[in-house]
């Protein structure tokens, strides 16, 4: 598989720092029961990965137009998943309908789009977790910023999100509400 160069920076942020590498390294140090250590909460795990892509701006990354384009196309790709997966599994879209929508609304290659659509056919709902998780983390961050005002600290917020390992989003929301 070949990826365009404009995806390199955002992919690195998602998979490495501050994305999954950071998230999983911290989780592996926690004293959690095995079912929590080795089971996954996709909306949390991939939601953090997608949320972290946006942190690239805060970290001074995406300095050139191509890197910014890469981040924006990745975010759009995850939003398209919401439409395409729902279209196929609720509105009875055909595989070709899904491919056409994806091609019309993304920067992905035809081969990438076909692979993605086949993934959604074989694993209904899974790909939705990325965007749903990201949106929940962003919602919780906005709430914490609003409630805490000048006392809001982004590092403390991220610590609060990650310090218990992967959680169902409603449980994460409870913990964030407790600090607000």
Predicted segments with their positions:
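N-terminal maturation segment of proteins
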Residues: 1-180
């Amino acid at each position: 598989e070949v990826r365009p160069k404009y995806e390199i920076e955002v992919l690195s942020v998602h998979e490495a720092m501050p994305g999954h590498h950071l998230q999983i390294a911290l989780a592996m140090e926690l004293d959690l029961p095995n079912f929590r250590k080795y089971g996954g909460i996709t909306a949390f795990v991939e939601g953090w990965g997608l949320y972290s892509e946006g942190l690239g701006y805060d970290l001074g990354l995406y300095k050139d137009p191509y890197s910014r384009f890469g981040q924006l196309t990745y975010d759009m790709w995850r939003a398209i998943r919401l439409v395409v997966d729902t279209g196929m599994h609720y509105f009875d879209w055909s595989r070709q309908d899904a491919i056409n929508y994806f091609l019309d609304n993304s920067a992905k290659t035809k081969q990438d789009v076909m692979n993605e659509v086949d993934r959604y056919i074989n694993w209904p709902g899974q790909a939705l977790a990325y965007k749903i998780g990201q949106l929940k983390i962003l919602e919780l961050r906005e709430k914490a910023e609003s409630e805490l005002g000048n006392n809001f600290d982004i590092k403390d917020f991220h610590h609060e999100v990650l310090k218990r390992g992967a959680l169902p989003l409603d449980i994460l929301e409870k913990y964030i509400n407790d600090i607000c």
